Each structure stands twice: as structure tokens, then as C-alpha cells.
Amino acid sequence: MSALSARDVDVVYSGKGGRSVTALSNVSLTIESGEFVVAVGASGCGKTTLLKLFAGFLPPSSGAITLGGKPVRGPGGERGVVFQDDALFPWLSVRGNIEFGPRLAGLDSAERKQRCGRIIDLVGLAEFADHRIWELSGGMRQRVGMARALANEPEILLMDEPLGALDALTREKMQELLIRLWDRTRRSVFLITHSVEEAIFLATRIVVLSPRPGRITREFHTDFSRRVLAGESSRSIKSDPAFIALREQVLAAVLKGADA
């Protein structure tokens, strides 16, 4: 799988009264194959802007976005996007939503059903495959959103606060599911969140962005997700003194930028 990179990227918007607003400044970040990278930072620091650059929804004002060394000039099937708002089609079933992308891509019926059936099992929705979207809970809808992104077999998943709207119990279960999906599919992941605890739990690498203009100020490497895969409970991991110590370090880095 290919590395997704931002190199010396600036994003400048036109603000009120003709004034320019710099959302990101001199940002360089490479997501290597198999990594789970999580971005944190204060509101307005440019996390979502960076994700939009990677997705091809937004061009940089300067610098370059590349995938496997080739310029990213727009959205593409090699990058799957999952939003906080699941953006599902309410008139379709779970299966219909998940099969939508492969159907649009022209995948033949037998292969489409086999691929999507496997993904439906992977996200734990086999019993609900023929349910309509409006019949599902928030957590189940997000499972459908993740499955729909995976159905196109992207090289990397780009996730914009996918668990932000969920209650605490559902969110923790979904964090565990995300780790299992990452492990089993071997996809790279770039996720943004406001939760430092969530970042530490999920990531192999955390990047901290400063307030606007957003710059990457710190990076932290972590591997608590491996303990989830080994069968340790979320509560045990999150109460570990090493986890708590890292949480304080990351939070201090976020707050240092916000207070500057």
C-alpha cells in the first residue's frame, strides 16, 4: 500500500473584508502503510482541513499532497472517507448502502455480494443486513458507514470524528471495533478527534496541531491498541499509569498551543 503525504502545505482562505485567513501553515505529514495516525488539537486548528486535503476535497494553496508519490488532484477510490454524520441513504437497506460503491464501480453481482457480505460480518451487522437505516442505533449506523468505506477496498481510511456523536459506552465499543477493523483489513487510517484519551487508545502515532494557523507541533508514538488485540479490556488499559501519564503529556501539548 502507498504512503499518503502532505509536504510543506499551506491553506489560505479569503476572509471577511478581503482579509486572508491561514488555516494550515507549512504542514508536512506522511501516513505510512499500516499506520493508525490520529490528529488532535484545539477547535479550529485545521484538523478537518488537513483531512479534506488528503481526501482530495480541497486543494492546498501551496505545497503538495501525494499518494504513492503521485499528486492527489481530487477524490479517489483509494481513499475511503467516514464522517461524524454518517451520510447514509435512508431509503436503502444496510446491505444496499454497503454495496452502493462497488455497484457504482461496476463490480459484478457475485463478487459484490461476496465482498460486502464479508464486510457486513466483519462489522457485526449480519443480523441487520436487510434493515433500513432509520431502524438502526447511532452506533450501528456508524458501523454501516465504516463498512461502506471499506467495501470500495481503499488503501487508507480518512475518518472525521466518526465517534464524536456517540454515548460513552457505545463509543468505547466502537473504539475496540475500529482497532479490530484496522488489524484485520491492514488498511492505513488517519482519524481526527477532540478526545485525547481516544487518540492514545487508537493510534500508533499521534500528531498535535497548534491553533490557527495549524502547524504540527508534537508527535507521540503509542501501541496501546496492541493490548486490545491481545484481549485486554479497555478499562484496564485506560486505567494503566502509563496510559494516564501519556494522556497528560498529550493534553499538555494541546493546551500549550491553545494558551500560546
Describe the role of every protein-language-model region:
Residues M1-A3, V12-N26:
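A short, flexible loop at the N-terminus of ABC-type nucleotide-binding domains that lies
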Residues V40-A42:
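The feature captures the beta-strand-to-loop junction immediately N-terminal to the Walker
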Residues A55:
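Helix-to-loop junction immediately C-terminal to a conserved catalytic motif
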Residues G63-P75, R115:
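Conserved ABC transporter NBD signature motif
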Residues L92-F100:
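Short coil-to-helix segment of the ABC ATPase nucleotide-binding domain corresponding to the Q-loop/switch region
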Residues R103, A110-F128, R180:
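Conserved ABC ATPase "signature" region
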Residues H131-W134, N152:
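Conserved signature/switch motifs of ABC ATPase nucleotide-binding domains
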Residues M146:
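Hydrophobic anchor residue at the start of the ABC signature
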